[in-house]
Amino acid sequence: MYNFVKIFQSNFIDINKLSKFEIFLKTIFRIYSSPGRTHLLAHAADISAKYAVRKIYEYMRTDEEGIRILKEKPLLIRQDICFNELKKLPKNTLGYKYMEFLETYKLHAHDREVSHFIKDINESYILTRYRQIHDIAHVVYNLNISIEAEAALKLIELIQTKLPITLLAILIAPFMTPLYRFQYIFEHNIPSNFLCPNFDYTYNDDYNYIDEMSLKQYEYYLTDYFHVEKRESQSFYYKLYKYYFDNLNNSSHVRGSIIYGYQNKNYNDIHYDKLNNEYLYLKNNIKNYFHFQYKPRKLLLTNLYPWAYKTAIQTNKPLHSIYVEKWFDKDIDLFRKKYNITPLPSNLNLMAGIN
Protein backbone atom coordinates (compact mmCIF):
# COMPACT_ATOMS: atom_id res chain seq x y z
CA MET A 1 0.00 0.00 0.00
CA TYR A 2 2.75 2.42 1.01
CA ASN A 3 4.72 1.79 -2.18
CA PHE A 4 1.75 2.47 -4.43
CA VAL A 5 0.84 5.69 -2.61
CA LYS A 6 4.30 7.01 -3.43
CA ILE A 7 4.04 5.80 -7.02
CA PHE A 8 0.62 7.39 -7.43
CA GLN A 9 1.73 10.74 -6.00
CA SER A 10 4.81 10.91 -8.21
CA ASN A 11 3.11 9.83 -11.45
CA PHE A 12 -0.34 11.42 -11.45
CA ILE A 13 -0.75 14.14 -14.09
CA ASP A 14 -3.69 16.47 -13.50
CA ILE A 15 -4.90 17.85 -16.84
CA ASN A 16 -8.30 18.90 -18.17
CA LYS A 17 -10.57 16.81 -20.39
CA LEU A 18 -9.63 18.68 -23.57
CA SER A 19 -5.94 17.96 -23.03
CA LYS A 20 -6.72 14.31 -22.34
CA PHE A 21 -8.70 14.08 -25.57
CA GLU A 22 -5.81 15.62 -27.50
CA ILE A 23 -3.35 13.11 -26.00
CA PHE A 24 -5.74 10.26 -26.76
CA LEU A 25 -6.02 11.19 -30.45
CA LYS A 26 -2.27 11.62 -30.84
CA THR A 27 -1.48 8.29 -29.22
CA ILE A 28 -4.11 6.40 -31.22
CA PHE A 29 -2.65 7.64 -34.51
CA ARG A 30 0.88 6.76 -33.42
CA ILE A 31 0.16 3.31 -31.99
CA TYR A 32 -0.25 1.63 -35.38
CA SER A 33 3.04 2.93 -36.75
CA SER A 34 4.90 2.32 -33.47
CA PRO A 35 3.29 -0.67 -31.70
CA GLY A 36 6.47 -1.33 -29.76
CA ARG A 37 6.11 1.95 -27.87
CA THR A 38 3.90 0.54 -25.14
CA HIS A 39 3.65 3.81 -23.23
CA LEU A 40 1.46 5.15 -26.05
CA LEU A 41 -0.97 2.29 -25.55
CA ALA A 42 -0.85 2.90 -21.80
CA HIS A 43 -1.70 6.59 -22.16
CA ALA A 44 -4.62 5.82 -24.46
CA ALA A 45 -5.83 3.19 -22.00
CA ASP A 46 -5.59 5.65 -19.10
CA ILE A 47 -7.77 8.19 -20.81
CA SER A 48 -10.37 5.76 -22.17
CA ALA A 49 -10.58 3.45 -19.15
CA LYS A 50 -12.60 5.56 -16.72
CA TYR A 51 -15.91 3.69 -16.80
CA ALA A 52 -14.44 0.22 -17.25
CA VAL A 53 -12.06 0.68 -14.32
CA ARG A 54 -14.90 1.95 -12.16
CA LYS A 55 -16.86 -1.23 -12.94
CA ILE A 56 -13.84 -3.34 -11.98
CA TYR A 57 -13.53 -1.39 -8.73
CA GLU A 58 -17.19 -1.95 -7.89
CA TYR A 59 -16.74 -5.68 -8.50
CA MET A 60 -13.60 -5.92 -6.39
CA ARG A 61 -15.30 -4.10 -3.50
CA THR A 62 -17.83 -6.92 -3.28
CA ASP A 63 -15.27 -9.74 -3.54
CA GLU A 64 -13.34 -10.94 -0.48
CA GLU A 65 -10.09 -11.37 -2.37
CA GLY A 66 -10.65 -8.12 -4.24
CA ILE A 67 -11.16 -6.22 -0.99
CA ARG A 68 -7.85 -7.51 0.31
CA ILE A 69 -6.05 -6.54 -2.90
CA LEU A 70 -7.49 -3.01 -2.79
CA LYS A 71 -6.50 -2.66 0.85
CA GLU A 72 -2.93 -3.96 0.56
CA LYS A 73 -2.27 -2.85 -3.05
CA PRO A 74 0.47 -5.41 -3.80
CA LEU A 75 2.83 -4.62 -6.67
CA LEU A 76 5.11 -6.76 -8.80
CA ILE A 77 8.16 -4.66 -7.98
CA ARG A 78 11.45 -5.39 -6.22
CA GLN A 79 10.31 -3.67 -3.04
CA ASP A 80 7.43 -6.14 -2.69
CA ILE A 81 8.68 -9.30 -4.44
CA CYS A 82 12.03 -11.07 -4.10
CA PHE A 83 12.38 -12.11 -7.72
CA ASN A 84 15.60 -14.06 -7.20
CA GLU A 85 13.81 -16.30 -4.71
CA LEU A 86 11.19 -17.16 -7.34
CA LYS A 87 13.94 -18.73 -9.45
CA LYS A 88 14.62 -21.21 -6.64
CA LEU A 89 11.05 -22.51 -6.54
CA PRO A 90 10.09 -25.91 -8.05
CA LYS A 91 9.85 -25.74 -11.83
CA ASN A 92 6.09 -26.19 -12.09
CA THR A 93 5.20 -23.41 -9.65
CA LEU A 94 3.60 -20.21 -10.86
CA GLY A 95 6.50 -18.12 -9.52
CA TYR A 96 9.16 -20.15 -11.32
CA LYS A 97 7.20 -20.13 -14.58
CA TYR A 98 6.70 -16.37 -14.24
CA MET A 99 10.43 -15.73 -13.82
CA GLU A 100 11.26 -18.13 -16.65
CA PHE A 101 8.91 -16.18 -18.93
CA LEU A 102 10.36 -12.79 -17.93
CA GLU A 103 13.94 -13.92 -18.46
CA THR A 104 13.16 -15.70 -21.71
CA TYR A 105 11.65 -12.59 -23.26
CA LYS A 106 13.86 -10.07 -21.42
CA LEU A 107 10.91 -8.49 -19.60
CA HIS A 108 10.20 -7.18 -16.12
CA ALA A 109 7.07 -6.00 -14.35
CA HIS A 110 8.93 -2.74 -13.67
CA ASP A 111 8.66 -2.05 -17.39
CA ARG A 112 4.88 -1.77 -17.20
CA GLU A 113 3.66 1.82 -17.36
CA VAL A 114 1.87 3.08 -14.26
CA SER A 115 -1.39 4.99 -14.55
CA HIS A 116 -0.96 8.76 -15.04
CA PHE A 117 -4.36 10.29 -15.71
CA ILE A 118 -6.78 8.67 -13.24
CA LYS A 119 -7.47 10.77 -10.12
CA ASP A 120 -8.86 8.08 -7.83
CA ILE A 121 -6.03 6.15 -6.17
CA ASN A 122 -7.95 2.85 -6.12
CA GLU A 123 -8.89 3.07 -9.78
CA SER A 124 -5.35 4.13 -10.67
CA TYR A 125 -4.05 1.09 -8.81
CA ILE A 126 -6.45 -1.25 -10.63
CA LEU A 127 -5.17 -0.11 -14.03
CA THR A 128 -1.55 -0.36 -12.90
CA ARG A 129 -2.16 -3.85 -11.53
CA TYR A 130 -3.88 -4.92 -14.74
CA ARG A 131 -0.70 -4.02 -16.64
CA GLN A 132 1.60 -5.80 -14.21
CA ILE A 133 -0.56 -8.92 -14.21
CA HIS A 134 -0.39 -9.01 -18.02
CA ASP A 135 2.84 -11.05 -17.97
CA ILE A 136 1.35 -13.53 -15.52
CA ALA A 137 -1.57 -13.89 -17.92
CA HIS A 138 0.92 -14.89 -20.62
CA VAL A 139 2.21 -17.58 -18.28
CA VAL A 140 -1.07 -19.08 -17.08
CA TYR A 141 -2.58 -19.07 -20.58
CA ASN A 142 0.76 -20.22 -22.11
CA LEU A 143 1.01 -17.48 -24.74
CA ASN A 144 4.25 -16.14 -26.20
CA ILE A 145 4.74 -12.49 -27.19
CA SER A 146 4.14 -12.73 -30.94
CA ILE A 147 1.55 -10.35 -32.38
CA GLU A 148 -1.05 -13.09 -32.74
CA ALA A 149 -0.52 -14.37 -29.18
CA GLU A 150 -0.76 -10.83 -27.77
CA ALA A 151 -3.99 -10.28 -29.69
CA ALA A 152 -5.50 -13.47 -28.29
CA LEU A 153 -4.60 -12.34 -24.78
CA LYS A 154 -6.18 -8.94 -25.45
CA LEU A 155 -9.45 -10.70 -26.27
CA ILE A 156 -9.29 -12.50 -22.92
CA GLU A 157 -8.58 -9.18 -21.22
CA LEU A 158 -11.43 -7.47 -23.05
CA ILE A 159 -13.92 -10.02 -21.74
CA GLN A 160 -12.49 -9.80 -18.23
CA THR A 161 -11.98 -6.02 -17.98
CA LYS A 162 -14.09 -4.36 -20.71
CA LEU A 163 -11.24 -1.89 -21.28
CA PRO A 164 -11.80 -0.10 -24.63
CA ILE A 165 -8.12 -0.16 -25.57
CA THR A 166 -8.18 -3.97 -25.64
CA LEU A 167 -10.91 -3.83 -28.29
CA LEU A 168 -8.77 -1.52 -30.38
CA ALA A 169 -5.87 -3.98 -30.17
CA ILE A 170 -8.12 -6.88 -31.19
CA LEU A 171 -9.36 -5.01 -34.27
CA ILE A 172 -5.94 -3.78 -35.39
CA ALA A 173 -3.97 -6.97 -34.73
CA PRO A 174 -5.09 -8.93 -37.83
CA PHE A 175 -3.76 -6.14 -40.07
CA MET A 176 -0.39 -6.20 -38.31
CA THR A 177 -0.02 -9.98 -38.17
CA PRO A 178 2.16 -11.59 -40.89
CA LEU A 179 0.46 -13.67 -43.55
CA TYR A 180 3.19 -16.32 -43.34
CA ARG A 181 5.86 -17.28 -40.87
CA PHE A 182 8.61 -19.84 -41.36
CA GLN A 183 10.70 -20.93 -38.43
CA TYR A 184 14.36 -21.83 -38.36
CA ILE A 185 14.81 -23.81 -35.15
CA PHE A 186 17.95 -25.00 -33.37
CA GLU A 187 17.89 -27.56 -30.58
CA HIS A 188 20.77 -25.99 -28.67
CA ASN A 189 22.64 -22.72 -29.14
CA ILE A 190 22.60 -20.71 -32.34
CA PRO A 191 25.77 -21.52 -34.33
CA SER A 192 28.50 -18.93 -33.75
CA ASN A 193 28.72 -18.21 -37.48
CA PHE A 194 24.96 -17.71 -37.89
CA LEU A 195 25.34 -14.10 -39.07
CA CYS A 196 28.38 -14.68 -41.23
CA PRO A 197 28.08 -14.28 -45.03
CA ASN A 198 29.26 -17.85 -45.61
CA PHE A 199 26.72 -19.53 -43.28
CA ASP A 200 24.60 -22.16 -45.05
CA TYR A 201 21.00 -21.13 -44.32
CA THR A 202 19.50 -24.48 -45.26
CA TYR A 203 18.08 -27.46 -43.45
CA ASN A 204 21.15 -29.27 -42.16
CA ASP A 205 20.99 -32.33 -39.89
CA ASP A 206 24.22 -31.25 -38.18
CA TYR A 207 22.27 -28.55 -36.33
CA ASN A 208 19.81 -30.93 -34.64
CA TYR A 209 16.54 -29.25 -35.51
CA ILE A 210 13.47 -29.96 -33.40
CA ASP A 211 10.31 -31.16 -35.12
CA GLU A 212 8.06 -31.61 -32.10
CA MET A 213 4.85 -32.00 -34.08
CA SER A 214 6.23 -34.07 -36.98
CA LEU A 215 4.81 -31.53 -39.38
CA LYS A 216 4.94 -31.94 -43.11
CA GLN A 217 7.78 -30.02 -44.71
CA TYR A 218 6.69 -27.48 -47.28
CA GLU A 219 8.12 -26.66 -50.65
CA TYR A 220 8.38 -22.95 -51.08
CA TYR A 221 10.07 -20.87 -53.74
CA LEU A 222 11.20 -17.49 -52.52
CA THR A 223 11.72 -15.98 -55.95
CA ASP A 224 8.38 -17.15 -57.36
CA TYR A 225 6.30 -15.84 -54.48
CA PHE A 226 8.13 -12.69 -53.44
CA HIS A 227 9.65 -11.75 -56.81
CA VAL A 228 13.11 -11.43 -55.33
CA GLU A 229 15.82 -11.50 -57.95
CA LYS A 230 18.92 -11.41 -55.79
CA ARG A 231 18.76 -14.64 -53.80
CA GLU A 232 21.49 -16.24 -55.94
CA SER A 233 23.92 -13.77 -54.44
CA GLN A 234 26.20 -15.44 -51.90
CA SER A 235 25.50 -12.73 -49.33
CA PHE A 236 21.71 -12.58 -49.79
CA TYR A 237 20.73 -14.57 -46.71
CA TYR A 238 23.37 -12.88 -44.63
CA LYS A 239 21.94 -9.50 -45.57
CA LEU A 240 18.42 -10.73 -44.92
CA TYR A 241 19.21 -11.84 -41.36
CA LYS A 242 21.42 -8.84 -40.67
CA TYR A 243 18.58 -6.55 -41.72
CA TYR A 244 16.17 -8.41 -39.45
CA PHE A 245 18.34 -8.13 -36.35
CA ASP A 246 19.29 -4.52 -37.05
CA ASN A 247 15.62 -3.54 -37.27
CA LEU A 248 14.20 -5.86 -34.65
CA ASN A 249 13.05 -2.99 -32.42
CA ASN A 250 11.82 -0.85 -35.29
CA SER A 251 8.26 -1.99 -35.77
CA SER A 252 7.79 0.03 -38.96
CA HIS A 253 10.43 -2.19 -40.58
CA VAL A 254 9.88 -5.49 -38.79
CA ARG A 255 6.41 -6.71 -37.86
CA GLY A 256 6.81 -9.56 -35.45
CA SER A 257 8.97 -10.91 -32.67
CA ILE A 258 11.73 -13.36 -32.00
CA ILE A 259 10.06 -16.28 -30.27
CA TYR A 260 12.23 -18.26 -27.88
CA GLY A 261 11.27 -21.89 -28.16
CA TYR A 262 12.61 -25.24 -27.01
CA GLN A 263 14.50 -24.93 -23.70
CA ASN A 264 14.52 -21.14 -24.17
CA LYS A 265 17.50 -21.37 -26.53
CA ASN A 266 15.92 -21.22 -29.97
CA TYR A 267 15.32 -18.50 -32.49
CA ASN A 268 12.28 -18.62 -34.75
CA ASP A 269 12.73 -15.80 -37.20
CA ILE A 270 10.74 -13.73 -39.65
CA HIS A 271 11.99 -10.90 -41.82
CA TYR A 272 10.15 -7.90 -43.19
CA ASP A 273 11.44 -6.64 -46.51
CA LYS A 274 10.83 -2.89 -46.55
CA LEU A 275 11.58 -2.48 -50.25
CA ASN A 276 9.01 -5.03 -51.42
CA ASN A 277 6.62 -4.40 -48.53
CA GLU A 278 6.40 -8.15 -47.93
CA TYR A 279 7.59 -10.81 -45.53
CA LEU A 280 10.64 -12.80 -46.56
CA TYR A 281 11.70 -16.12 -45.09
CA LEU A 282 14.38 -18.71 -45.55
CA LYS A 283 14.36 -20.88 -48.62
CA ASN A 284 16.07 -24.26 -48.49
CA ASN A 285 18.07 -24.44 -51.70
CA ILE A 286 19.19 -28.04 -51.25
CA LYS A 287 16.13 -29.94 -50.00
CA ASN A 288 13.48 -27.44 -51.10
CA TYR A 289 11.57 -27.24 -47.85
CA PHE A 290 11.37 -25.15 -44.74
CA HIS A 291 11.48 -26.66 -41.32
CA PHE A 292 8.06 -25.36 -40.30
CA GLN A 293 5.42 -23.11 -41.85
CA TYR A 294 2.20 -21.57 -40.59
CA LYS A 295 -0.02 -18.59 -41.31
CA PRO A 296 -0.21 -16.27 -38.26
CA ARG A 297 -3.16 -14.18 -39.48
CA LYS A 298 -5.25 -17.22 -40.34
CA LEU A 299 -4.19 -18.85 -37.07
CA LEU A 300 -5.31 -15.76 -35.13
CA LEU A 301 -8.73 -15.48 -36.77
CA THR A 302 -9.65 -19.16 -36.99
CA ASN A 303 -7.98 -20.65 -33.90
CA LEU A 304 -6.64 -18.17 -31.38
CA TYR A 305 -9.59 -15.77 -31.19
CA PRO A 306 -12.17 -18.59 -30.78
CA TRP A 307 -10.03 -20.28 -28.13
CA ALA A 308 -9.43 -16.99 -26.29
CA TYR A 309 -13.14 -16.17 -26.22
CA LYS A 310 -14.06 -19.61 -24.92
CA THR A 311 -11.40 -19.71 -22.21
CA ALA A 312 -12.17 -16.15 -21.09
CA ILE A 313 -15.87 -16.76 -20.50
CA GLN A 314 -15.27 -20.03 -18.65
CA THR A 315 -12.59 -18.59 -16.32
CA ASN A 316 -14.42 -18.01 -13.05
CA LYS A 317 -12.47 -14.94 -11.94
CA PRO A 318 -10.49 -12.21 -13.76
CA LEU A 319 -6.76 -12.29 -13.03
CA HIS A 320 -6.54 -8.72 -11.74
CA SER A 321 -8.89 -9.62 -8.87
CA ILE A 322 -6.89 -12.72 -7.89
CA TYR A 323 -4.13 -12.33 -5.32
CA VAL A 324 -1.68 -14.09 -7.63
CA GLU A 325 1.30 -13.25 -5.45
CA LYS A 326 0.00 -15.75 -2.89
CA TRP A 327 0.15 -18.46 -5.57
CA PHE A 328 3.78 -18.01 -6.59
CA ASP A 329 4.99 -21.00 -4.55
CA LYS A 330 2.13 -23.24 -5.66
CA ASP A 331 1.70 -25.52 -8.67
CA ILE A 332 0.58 -23.62 -11.76
CA ASP A 333 -1.81 -26.42 -12.71
CA LEU A 334 -3.54 -26.11 -9.33
CA PHE A 335 -3.91 -22.38 -9.98
CA ARG A 336 -5.47 -23.08 -13.36
CA LYS A 337 -7.80 -25.68 -11.89
CA LYS A 338 -8.87 -23.36 -9.06
CA TYR A 339 -9.93 -20.60 -11.45
CA ASN A 340 -10.95 -22.83 -14.36
CA ILE A 341 -8.27 -21.46 -16.67
CA THR A 342 -7.70 -23.36 -19.92
CA PRO A 343 -4.20 -22.79 -21.34
CA LEU A 344 -3.42 -22.77 -25.04
CA PRO A 345 -4.20 -26.17 -26.63
CA SER A 346 -1.15 -28.31 -27.33
CA ASN A 347 -1.78 -28.30 -31.09
CA LEU A 348 -1.24 -24.51 -31.11
CA ASN A 349 1.72 -24.52 -28.76
CA LEU A 350 4.47 -24.50 -31.38
CA MET A 351 2.88 -21.52 -33.13
CA ALA A 352 1.76 -19.32 -30.23
CA GLY A 353 2.86 -21.03 -27.01
CA ILE A 354 5.76 -20.27 -24.71
CA ASN A 355 7.13 -23.82 -25.31
UniProtKB/Swiss-Prot annotation:
**Topology of this chain in the membrane:** Peripheral membrane protein
As for subcellular location, the record says: Mitochondrion inner membrane
| Classification via Pfam families | Coq4 (PF05019)
Annotated pathway: Cofactor biosynthesis; ubiquinone biosynthesis
What else the UniProt entry mentions is: This protein may be expected to contain an N-terminal transit peptide but none has been predicted.
User: What is the top EC class of this enzyme, as a single word?
Assistant: lyase
Q: Which GO terms describe its cellular component?
A: extrinsic component of mitochondrial inner membrane
Q: What GO biological process terms does the UniProt entry carry, in alphabetical order? A: ubiquinone biosynthetic process
InterPro entries of this UniProt entry? Coq4, Coq4_euk
Name the reaction it catalyses.
Answer: a 4-hydroxy-3-methoxy-5-(all-trans-polyprenyl)benzoate + H(+) = a 2-methoxy-6-(all-trans-polyprenyl)phenol + CO2
Q: Which organism is it from?
A: Plasmodium falciparum (isolate 3D7)
State the protein's purpose.
Lyase that catalyzes the C1-decarboxylation of 4-hydroxy-3-methoxy-5-(all-trans-polyprenyl)benzoic acid into 2-methoxy-6-(all-trans-polyprenyl)phenol during ubiquinone biosynthesis.
Record keywords, A-Z: Lyase, Membrane, Metal-binding, Mitochondrion, Mitochondrion inner membrane, Ubiquinone biosynthesis, Zinc
Cofactor requirements of the protein = Zn(2+)
Source species, domain of life = Eukaryota
Family that this chain belongs to: Belongs to the COQ4 family.
What protein name does the entry list?
Ubiquinone biosynthesis protein COQ4 homolog, mitochondrial
Known EC number: 4.1.1.130
**Sites where the protein binds Zn(2+):** 134-135, 138, 150
Q: How does it assemble?
A: Component of a multi-subunit COQ enzyme complex.
